[in-house]
């Protein structure tokens, strides 16, 4: 054999279930993401046919091909890799690519005119192999959203079917640099 086989150590596992018909709770999403291993620290590996192989320290998103993993400082692919745009030192590398995270999403459609969803994520970061944090950093992100679709005989025709959506979001912890809050109001058809 001219290859080396390794156990899976880093994972992104997800589960989604949709209930039918629509109800107060009609969708559940759970995700688990583990990126702390990254082939482990540097080690020398070999077999009878591969005389020398150096592995480890994969450094996810930091393979010095930056245009492939970010665009204008924003991470592409997974939002849990904190974007280089937020680096206080001006570098374009990802400072927290070794972490474990849990994500939960819930959604419902209790009537023809009302929808809601909730998203919550917990993350524990270690930094990188090259620049580890001196202590673990934690973060919690939450978002709640409700949508009401306008309807009824007294409404002007142009207002019927318009969605009015209100969202509230917050994150707390050291990974995203402090506590942040926001609200959003959306009107769309």
Predicted regions and their residues:
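Outer-membrane beta-barrel pore domains
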Residues: 1-189
